[in-house]
Amino acid sequence: IAFSAVLHYNTKSSRISAEIPNQQKGSDMKSHFTPHKDITGTLSILLATLCWGFSGCSGQYLLHDLALPTPVVLCIRQISAGIILIALDLLFRKSTQRHASCRSSIRTSKKDLLILIFFAIFGICLTQYTFFMAIYYSDSGTATVLQYLSTILIFLVTCVRTKTLPTKTESAAVLAAVAGTFLISTGGRPGNLAISGYALLFGVICAISYSTYTLIPGRIVRTYGAKYVVGRGMLISGILLSLFVRPWTYEIPLSSEVILGFCGLILVGTAAGSTFYHFGASLLSPVKAGTLANFDPVSSVLLTALLLGTTFTATDLAGFFCIIGAVFLLQLCRGRLT
């Protein structure tokens, strides 16, 4: 249903935009975001965040309950997700006939190809590895919330680049994120670690690498499209990681639990999540789409507690609230720096 909706919307949008004269496009864009599209887009992105949260729970299930090796799970996930995103990219491009000339140009542009490889290694591979290690040493909810500290890091980098001082609201958001990290890591007791030191280490590295994941591919994403770049980046990172991990040397039981776990991790988290998000984003303004996507850590915490029975203390929840609230504040303020 999601695939059909996206194809129908993209085809219809392309046909309509081709029929509108240039002098009328500015006025017609004001009426682009109708109430019906707003509701549909909002629900689609919220469904995407639930898919991402369920994907994290599936990863935790594979690592904790089924005790599968983290590097092997990551190799399978990266290669499978890369193939799925490449297939979705080809499907959407074929239906809309957009960027047809861009598809092969990245292989002929040495600079773009190097950026893609750098992005695959230091953006995707490092982010995913540290994220899954954070899940291994803690849980999906905590790992996801710590990963979203990347929003704070990206904001600070943007302030330095634009030579802009943060406003009082933005400063409060940064302080809230720091306070949230303190509460999660110490339980509110200085000198005491409430979570594994490795979980905190990998969570912070994940936030840093996720900032790289967001900032590095900006130009090539604008040129080739998000699914084109991320799909190929995931496939490259999965292949390179497999050369070191050699997943074929491990014996992975093909039980129904393992298969269902990987289906949740790959099909729900990647295929369904990506489809719902891009469909919703096509119906909403960029700011609203980005703000709604920040419900990802909320869904991760809720699903981890409901599906896997993970318990969180009041201090944990307070820390989650501080970080997630900071992310929403900065998302709402981001237009000032963009």
Where are these regions (language model features)?
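Hydrophobic/aromatic residues within transmembrane alpha-helices
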Residues: 62, 73, 134, 139, ...
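C-terminal-most transmembrane helix of multi-pass membrane proteins
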Residues: 30-31, 78, 185-186, 258-260, ...
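Specific transmembrane alpha-helical segments of multi-pass solute transporters/efflux pumps
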Residues: 92-141, 147, 183, 266-284
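Helix-helix packing/entry segments at the starts of transmembrane helices
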Residues: 49, 76, 124, 142-149, ...
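Juxtamembrane helix-entry segments on the extracytoplasmic side of multipass membrane proteins
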Residues: 37-42, 66-71, 75, 108-112, ...
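Glycine-/small-residue-enriched transmembrane alpha-helix faces in small-molecule transporters
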Residues: 2-4, 8-76, 192-219, 239, ...
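Transmembrane alpha-helices of multi-pass small-molecule transport proteins
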Residues: 66-125, 153-157, 208-216, 230-249, ...
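C-terminal transmembrane-helix exit sites in multi-pass transporters
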Residues: 84, 89, 150-175, 298-318
